[in-house]
Amino acid sequence: MEVIVPFSTERPKSRLSAVLTPDERAAFARTMLQDVLAAIDAADGEPRILATGAVGIDLPSPVEIDDRPLTDAVNAAIDARLGNDGAERVAVVMADLALATPNALRELFAAGREAEVAIAPGRGGGTNAFVAGHPAFRVDYHGASYLDHRRIADEIGAGVRVVDSHRLATDVDEPADLAELLIHAEADGDGGRAARWLRDAGFALDTTDGRVGVRRE
């Protein structure tokens, strides 16, 4: 299954500006992208990067440049693949799902083969990943996009499967999300490139106030 991975090269991860410099945010975003690509590949997906500009590192997957807003770029990519009797299914997986595992993605892909639309909602009402097989399905990433995508699927008469996955629901956007990444990396024995990048940058789990957070040494 072809898997589109949108990636923004313009001011990436701006909500991490309290803990990372602009250069660090760009580097961290690229490591998360690499983790997502590796997980997709291990799940027998075929990742294709949809970037707003040059990514800046060598990657094993093809890169398509589209500097339009996310909704427009993803809709164009879907239309190019599902329109005119094209591919039977196409997936979209966000590049900041650093907790994504091959097993979680296999579950998403399997759901997408059984339903016309399979959605993995994110925390806070977003849409972190989906598989579309209905040629009329389109995205709208503004606001509570999970609800919007359920509505869009209903309007076109597409059957929907919801994939309830902590691994796919957790996108790394804010400082509190860094703790989630380090927790699972420790539980898994190492973690991926993004977790190693954080540790190399001096980040560690902090439980001094009774809640789990991160500190930078």
Curated annotation (Swiss-Prot):
Signal sequence span is none
- Which InterPro entries does its entry note? CofC (IPR002835), Nucleotide-diphossugar_trans (IPR029044)
Q: Which domain of life is it from?
A: Archaea
This enzyme catalyses:
(2S)-2-phospholactate + GTP + H(+) = (2S)-lactyl-2-diphospho-5'-guanosine + diphosphate
Q: Which GO terms describe its molecular function?
A: GTP binding; phospholactate guanylyltransferase activity
Q: What class of enzyme is it?
A: transferase
Query: Which keywords fit this entry according to its UniProt record?
Result: GTP-binding, Nucleotide-binding, Nucleotidyltransferase, Transferase
Q: Name one GO biological process term.
A: F420-0 metabolic process
Q: In which pathway does it act?
A: Cofactor biosynthesis; coenzyme F420 biosynthesis
* Database matches in Pfam families: CofC
> EC number(s) for this protein?
2.7.7.68
Under the heading NCBIfam families, the entry gives: F420_cofC
Q: State the HAMAP family in the record.
A: CofC (MF_02114)
Record note on quaternary structure: Homodimer.
Q: What does this protein do?
A: Guanylyltransferase that catalyzes the activation of (2S)-2-phospholactate (2-PL) as (2S)-lactyl-2-diphospho-5'-guanosine, via the condensation of 2-PL with GTP. It is involved in the biosynthesis of coenzyme F420, a hydride carrier cofactor.
Into which family does the record put it?
Answer: Belongs to the CofC family.
Protein name from the UniProt record: 2-phospho-L-lactate guanylyltransferase
Which source organism? Halorubrum lacusprofundi (strain ATCC 49239 / DSM 5036 / JCM 8891 / ACAM 34)
Gene field: cofC
